[in-house]
Protein backbone atom coordinates (compact mmCIF):
# COMPACT_ATOMS: atom_id res chain seq x y z
CA UNK A 1 0.00 0.00 0.00
CA UNK A 2 1.30 3.43 -0.93
CA UNK A 3 0.69 6.74 0.84
CA UNK A 4 -0.06 9.92 -1.10
CA UNK A 5 1.61 13.23 -0.25
CA UNK A 6 -0.07 16.64 -0.38
CA UNK A 7 1.87 19.91 -0.63
CA UNK A 8 -0.11 23.15 -0.15
CA UNK A 9 2.16 25.61 -1.94
CA UNK A 10 2.13 29.40 -1.81
CA UNK A 11 4.14 32.09 -3.55
CA UNK A 12 6.42 33.05 -0.66
CA UNK A 13 9.49 31.04 -1.71
CA UNK A 14 12.84 32.57 -0.79
CA UNK A 15 14.71 30.39 -3.30
CA UNK A 16 12.77 30.28 -6.58
CA UNK A 17 10.75 27.26 -5.37
CA UNK A 18 13.88 25.14 -4.94
CA UNK A 19 12.70 24.29 -1.41
CA UNK A 20 10.04 22.10 -3.02
CA UNK A 21 12.57 20.68 -5.47
CA UNK A 22 14.79 19.27 -2.74
CA UNK A 23 11.86 18.16 -0.59
CA UNK A 24 10.62 16.06 -3.52
CA UNK A 25 14.10 14.66 -4.09
CA UNK A 26 14.26 13.57 -0.45
CA UNK A 27 10.92 11.75 -0.81
CA UNK A 28 12.04 9.95 -3.95
CA UNK A 29 15.23 8.85 -2.24
CA UNK A 30 14.05 7.75 1.20
CA UNK A 31 10.28 7.06 1.32
CA UNK A 32 9.64 3.41 0.50
CA UNK A 33 5.82 3.56 0.20
CA UNK A 34 5.53 6.86 -1.65
CA UNK A 35 2.31 7.16 -3.63
CA UNK A 36 0.87 10.03 -5.61
CA UNK A 37 2.28 13.53 -5.18
CA UNK A 38 -0.36 16.28 -5.15
CA UNK A 39 0.65 19.95 -5.21
CA UNK A 40 -2.11 22.50 -4.63
CA UNK A 41 -1.55 26.19 -5.29
CA UNK A 42 1.36 27.84 -7.04
CA UNK A 43 3.08 25.95 -9.89
CA UNK A 44 6.89 26.22 -10.06
CA UNK A 45 8.32 26.72 -13.55
CA UNK A 46 10.34 23.49 -13.36
CA UNK A 47 7.49 21.23 -12.17
CA UNK A 48 6.57 18.34 -14.49
CA UNK A 49 2.78 18.06 -14.28
CA UNK A 50 2.91 14.73 -16.12
CA UNK A 51 4.55 13.13 -13.05
CA UNK A 52 2.58 14.85 -10.28
CA UNK A 53 -0.96 16.16 -9.88
CA UNK A 54 -1.07 19.95 -9.76
CA UNK A 55 -4.26 21.72 -8.67
CA UNK A 56 -4.14 25.49 -9.30
CA UNK A 57 -5.42 27.61 -6.43
CA UNK A 58 -4.64 31.21 -5.61
CA UNK A 59 -4.04 32.42 -2.07
CA UNK A 60 -6.74 34.49 -0.41
CA UNK A 61 -6.57 37.00 2.40
CA UNK A 62 -7.07 35.66 5.87
CA UNK A 63 -3.90 33.93 6.97
CA UNK A 64 -1.43 31.24 6.01
CA UNK A 65 -3.15 28.38 7.83
CA UNK A 66 -6.52 29.22 6.30
CA UNK A 67 -5.00 28.99 2.81
CA UNK A 68 -3.37 25.67 3.68
CA UNK A 69 -6.67 24.22 4.89
CA UNK A 70 -8.41 25.31 1.69
CA UNK A 71 -5.73 23.67 -0.43
CA UNK A 72 -5.66 20.41 1.53
CA UNK A 73 -9.46 20.21 1.33
CA UNK A 74 -9.18 20.48 -2.46
CA UNK A 75 -6.67 17.61 -2.45
CA UNK A 76 -8.90 15.34 -0.33
CA UNK A 77 -10.99 14.57 -3.42
CA UNK A 78 -7.94 13.15 -5.21
CA UNK A 79 -6.13 11.07 -2.56
CA UNK A 80 -6.47 7.30 -2.51
CA UNK A 81 -6.76 7.08 1.28
CA UNK A 82 -4.78 8.33 4.29
CA UNK A 83 -2.15 10.81 3.17
CA UNK A 84 0.72 12.91 4.51
CA UNK A 85 0.63 16.69 4.45
CA UNK A 86 4.05 18.23 3.93
CA UNK A 87 5.54 21.68 3.46
CA UNK A 88 8.11 22.55 0.84
CA UNK A 89 10.72 23.37 3.52
CA UNK A 90 10.73 19.84 4.97
CA UNK A 91 13.09 17.03 3.87
CA UNK A 92 13.39 13.35 4.78
CA UNK A 93 16.89 12.33 5.90
CA UNK A 94 16.63 8.53 6.32
CA UNK A 95 14.80 5.57 4.84
CA UNK A 96 11.26 5.29 6.18
CA UNK A 97 7.67 4.33 5.46
CA UNK A 98 4.92 6.93 5.59
CA UNK A 99 2.56 4.22 6.86
CA UNK A 100 4.60 4.23 10.10
CA UNK A 101 4.72 8.03 10.42
CA UNK A 102 3.54 9.20 13.88
CA UNK A 103 1.94 12.55 14.63
CA UNK A 104 4.76 14.71 15.97
CA UNK A 105 3.58 16.89 18.82
CA UNK A 106 3.83 17.69 22.51
CA UNK A 107 1.48 18.14 25.42
CA UNK A 108 0.73 21.81 25.96
CA UNK A 109 -0.54 23.77 28.94
CA UNK A 110 -3.68 25.86 28.76
CA UNK A 111 -3.05 29.44 27.74
CA UNK A 112 -4.41 32.12 30.07
CA UNK A 113 -5.07 35.47 28.44
CA UNK A 114 -5.05 35.97 24.69
CA UNK A 115 -1.43 36.65 23.61
CA UNK A 116 -0.48 39.64 21.50
CA UNK A 117 1.81 37.86 19.04
CA UNK A 118 0.02 36.58 15.95
CA UNK A 119 1.23 32.96 16.07
CA UNK A 120 0.49 32.58 19.78
CA UNK A 121 -2.88 34.25 19.29
CA UNK A 122 -3.80 31.73 16.59
CA UNK A 123 -2.87 28.89 18.95
CA UNK A 124 -4.97 30.51 21.67
CA UNK A 125 -8.06 30.65 19.43
CA UNK A 126 -7.50 27.01 18.47
CA UNK A 127 -7.18 25.99 22.11
CA UNK A 128 -10.32 27.88 23.12
CA UNK A 129 -12.36 26.25 20.36
CA UNK A 130 -11.15 22.77 21.33
CA UNK A 131 -11.83 23.41 25.04
CA UNK A 132 -15.41 24.52 24.34
CA UNK A 133 -16.06 21.14 22.73
CA UNK A 134 -14.34 19.10 25.42
CA UNK A 135 -11.50 18.03 23.15
CA UNK A 136 -7.94 17.49 24.25
CA UNK A 137 -5.31 20.08 23.47
CA UNK A 138 -1.92 18.91 22.25
CA UNK A 139 0.44 21.08 20.25
CA UNK A 140 0.99 19.44 16.84
CA UNK A 141 2.36 22.54 15.12
CA UNK A 142 6.01 21.49 15.19
CA UNK A 143 6.55 22.12 11.47
CA UNK A 144 6.69 18.41 10.63
CA UNK A 145 5.03 16.08 8.09
CA UNK A 146 1.52 15.29 9.33
CA UNK A 147 -0.43 12.04 8.72
CA UNK A 148 -4.03 12.85 7.75
CA UNK A 149 -7.30 11.06 7.12
CA UNK A 150 -9.37 12.68 4.34
CA UNK A 151 -12.68 11.96 6.11
CA UNK A 152 -11.61 13.68 9.32
CA UNK A 153 -10.05 16.53 7.38
CA UNK A 154 -13.35 17.10 5.56
CA UNK A 155 -15.12 17.15 8.93
CA UNK A 156 -12.66 19.80 10.08
CA UNK A 157 -13.36 21.74 6.90
CA UNK A 158 -17.05 21.94 7.81
CA UNK A 159 -16.28 23.79 11.05
CA UNK A 160 -16.37 27.57 11.06
CA UNK A 161 -13.40 28.10 13.37
CA UNK A 162 -10.83 28.22 10.58
CA UNK A 163 -13.05 30.43 8.41
CA UNK A 164 -14.04 33.01 11.05
CA UNK A 165 -10.96 33.01 13.27
CA UNK A 166 -7.32 32.33 12.63
CA UNK A 167 -6.18 28.94 13.88
CA UNK A 168 -3.27 26.52 13.49
CA UNK A 169 -3.87 23.70 11.03
CA UNK A 170 -1.97 20.79 12.60
CA UNK A 171 -3.15 21.40 16.16
CA UNK A 172 -6.76 21.75 15.04
CA UNK A 173 -6.65 18.56 12.97
CA UNK A 174 -4.57 16.48 15.38
CA UNK A 175 -6.91 17.06 18.33
CA UNK A 176 -10.08 16.56 16.28
CA UNK A 177 -8.61 13.25 15.07
CA UNK A 178 -7.62 12.22 18.61
CA UNK A 179 -3.97 11.72 17.70
CA UNK A 180 -1.34 10.97 20.34
CA UNK A 181 1.60 13.40 20.28
CA UNK A 182 4.98 11.88 19.56
CA UNK A 183 8.31 13.57 20.21
CA UNK A 184 10.68 12.64 17.42
CA UNK A 185 14.18 13.24 16.13
CA UNK A 186 13.79 16.39 14.06
CA UNK A 187 16.48 18.84 12.96
CA UNK A 188 15.37 22.48 12.90
CA UNK A 189 17.15 25.36 11.22
CA UNK A 190 15.18 28.49 12.10
CA UNK A 191 18.35 30.59 12.22
CA UNK A 192 21.61 30.47 10.21
CA UNK A 193 22.93 26.92 10.65
CA UNK A 194 26.67 27.64 10.65
CA UNK A 195 29.41 26.08 8.55
CA UNK A 196 28.96 23.18 6.12
CA UNK A 197 30.78 20.80 8.44
CA UNK A 198 28.23 21.38 11.21
CA UNK A 199 25.33 20.83 8.81
CA UNK A 200 26.66 17.56 7.38
CA UNK A 201 27.35 16.31 10.91
CA UNK A 202 23.91 17.31 12.22
CA UNK A 203 21.87 15.63 9.45
CA UNK A 204 23.25 12.14 10.13
CA UNK A 205 20.85 11.23 12.93
CA UNK A 206 17.42 12.91 12.62
CA UNK A 207 14.55 11.66 10.49
CA UNK A 208 13.46 15.07 9.18
CA UNK A 209 15.06 18.39 8.35
CA UNK A 210 12.85 21.47 8.77
CA UNK A 211 13.87 25.06 8.16
CA UNK A 212 12.47 28.51 7.50
CA UNK A 213 13.65 31.51 5.49
CA UNK A 214 16.00 32.64 8.26
CA UNK A 215 17.69 29.25 8.33
CA UNK A 216 17.92 28.96 4.55
CA UNK A 217 21.23 30.72 4.04
CA UNK A 218 23.86 29.96 1.38
CA UNK A 219 25.45 27.20 3.46
CA UNK A 220 22.20 25.26 3.86
CA UNK A 221 21.40 25.74 0.17
CA UNK A 222 24.77 24.28 -0.74
CA UNK A 223 24.27 21.39 1.70
CA UNK A 224 20.91 20.53 0.11
CA UNK A 225 22.46 20.42 -3.37
CA UNK A 226 25.12 18.01 -2.05
CA UNK A 227 22.72 15.77 -0.09
CA UNK A 228 20.15 15.48 -2.89
CA UNK A 229 21.97 15.79 -6.25
CA UNK A 230 19.75 13.40 -8.26
CA UNK A 231 16.88 14.77 -10.29
CA UNK A 232 13.40 13.56 -9.35
CA UNK A 233 10.70 12.55 -11.86
CA UNK A 234 8.72 15.58 -10.70
CA UNK A 235 11.24 17.91 -12.34
CA UNK A 236 10.94 18.90 -15.96
CA UNK A 237 12.92 16.87 -18.49
CA UNK A 238 13.99 20.02 -20.33
CA UNK A 239 17.76 19.87 -19.85
CA UNK A 240 18.29 23.18 -21.61
CA UNK A 241 17.99 24.71 -18.16
CA UNK A 242 21.48 24.68 -16.67
CA UNK A 243 21.53 22.85 -13.36
CA UNK A 244 24.13 24.88 -11.49
CA UNK A 245 23.85 25.21 -7.71
CA UNK A 246 25.95 28.38 -7.90
CA UNK A 247 23.17 30.07 -9.86
CA UNK A 248 20.81 29.38 -6.94
CA UNK A 249 23.28 30.16 -4.18
CA UNK A 250 24.66 33.40 -5.57
CA UNK A 251 21.85 34.49 -7.89
CA UNK A 252 22.00 34.70 -11.67
CA UNK A 253 25.71 35.47 -11.63
CA UNK A 254 27.52 32.27 -10.62
CA UNK A 255 30.47 34.19 -9.15
CA UNK A 256 30.39 34.78 -5.40
CA UNK A 257 29.44 38.27 -4.37
CA UNK A 258 32.46 39.43 -2.37
CA UNK A 259 32.32 42.71 -0.47
CA UNK A 260 35.23 45.01 -1.39
CA UNK A 261 37.91 45.18 1.28
CA UNK A 262 37.33 48.06 3.67
CA UNK A 263 40.07 50.05 5.50
CA UNK A 264 39.23 48.36 8.81
CA UNK A 265 39.54 44.96 7.11
CA UNK A 266 43.03 45.85 5.88
CA UNK A 267 44.20 46.84 9.37
CA UNK A 268 42.81 43.62 10.86
CA UNK A 269 44.58 41.59 8.17
CA UNK A 270 47.90 43.33 8.89
CA UNK A 271 47.58 42.67 12.63
CA UNK A 272 46.92 38.97 11.99
CA UNK A 273 49.89 38.76 9.65
CA UNK A 274 52.16 40.44 12.21
CA UNK A 275 50.96 38.08 14.92
CA UNK A 276 51.61 35.03 12.76
CA UNK A 277 55.06 36.34 11.80
CA UNK A 278 56.03 36.84 15.44
CA UNK A 279 54.89 33.32 16.31
CA UNK A 280 56.96 31.88 13.49
CA UNK A 281 59.99 33.89 14.64
CA UNK A 282 60.07 32.59 18.20
CA UNK A 283 60.05 28.95 17.05
CA UNK A 284 58.30 25.86 18.49
CA UNK A 285 59.85 26.15 21.96
CA UNK A 286 58.91 29.80 22.24
CA UNK A 287 55.35 29.07 21.15
CA UNK A 288 55.06 26.40 23.85
CA UNK A 289 56.30 28.85 26.52
CA UNK A 290 53.86 31.48 25.25
CA UNK A 291 50.93 29.05 25.43
CA UNK A 292 52.00 28.01 28.94
CA UNK A 293 52.07 31.65 30.12
CA UNK A 294 48.64 32.29 28.62
CA UNK A 295 47.28 29.16 30.26
CA UNK A 296 48.66 30.21 33.61
Predicted regions and their residues:
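Conserved donor-nucleotide/metal-binding helix-loop-beta segment in metal-dependent transferases, i.e.
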Residues: 94-124
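Short beta-strand-to-loop acidic/aromatic patch adjacent to the donor-nucleotide binding site
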Residues: 81-93
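Active-site nucleotide-sugar/metal-binding loop of Leloir-type enzymes
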Residues: 70-82
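N-terminal anchoring/stem segment of glycosyltransferases
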Residues: 1-61, 207-220, 224-262
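Boundary detector for helix-to-coil junctions that initiate low-complexity/charged tails
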Residues: 89, 260-296
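Short catalytic/ligand-binding loop motif for oxyanion handling, primarily in non-cytosolic enzymes
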Residues: 14-16, 45-49, 91-96, 100-102, ...
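Catalytic core and acceptor-binding pocket of nucleotide-sugar-dependent glycosyltransferases
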Residues: 123-214
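Active-site regions of enzymes building and remodeling cell-envelope glycoconjugates
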Residues: 47-67, 71-72, 98-106
Amino acid sequence: MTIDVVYPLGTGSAWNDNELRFSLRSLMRYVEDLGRIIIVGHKPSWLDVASVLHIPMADSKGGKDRNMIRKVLAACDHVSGPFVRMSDDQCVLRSMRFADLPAYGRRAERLGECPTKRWSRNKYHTQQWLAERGLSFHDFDLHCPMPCDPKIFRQMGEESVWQNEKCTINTLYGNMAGLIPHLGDILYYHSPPGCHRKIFSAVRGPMFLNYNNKGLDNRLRYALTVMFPDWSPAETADHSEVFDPNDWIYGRDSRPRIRPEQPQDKSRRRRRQASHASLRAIGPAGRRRLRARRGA
